[in-house]
């Protein structure tokens, strides 16, 4: 699964991109539910959230 680092700017770009709704707003940064994250396998060639993240803070867990 992927996770979001502390460099997250809380912009919200990632949340609507997740096909499994595994991303939600945490208290200070967005968070990825590891149980729900498929890294977009079966949905896209690469993780959609990481592709749109302007801070490049969505990384491999």
Curated annotation (Swiss-Prot):
Question: Which residues of this UniProt protein bind [4Fe-4S] cluster 2?
Answer: 18, 37, 40, 49
Q: What is this protein called?
A: Ferredoxin
Q: Which organism is it from?
A: Chlorobaculum thiosulfatiphilum (Chlorobium limicola f.sp. thiosulfatophilum)
Cofactor detail note: Binds 2 [4Fe-4S] clusters.
> Which Cys pairs are S-S linked?
none
Known InterPro entries for this protein?
A: 4Fe4S_Fe-S-bd, 4Fe4S_Fe_S_CS
Looking at the record, the residues that make up the 4Fe-4S ferredoxin-type domain are 2-28
- Cofactor field: [4Fe-4S] cluster
UniProt: [4Fe-4S] cluster 1 binding residues? 8, 11, 14, 53
Give the superkingdom in one word: Bacteria
Kindly state which keywords UniProt assigns to this record, in alphabetical order. 4Fe-4S, Electron transport, Iron, Iron-sulfur, Metal-binding, Repeat, Transport
Q: SUPFAM superfamilies from the xrefs?
A: 4Fe-4S ferredoxins
């Amino acid at each position: 699964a992927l996770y979001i680092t502390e460099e997250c700017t809380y912009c919200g770009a990632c949340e609507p991109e997740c096909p499994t709704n595994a991303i939600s707003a945490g208290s200070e940064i967005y968070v990825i539910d590891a149980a729900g994250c498929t890294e977009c396998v079966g949905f896209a060639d690469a993780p959609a959230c990481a592709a749109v993240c302007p801070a490049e803070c969505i990384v491999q867990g």
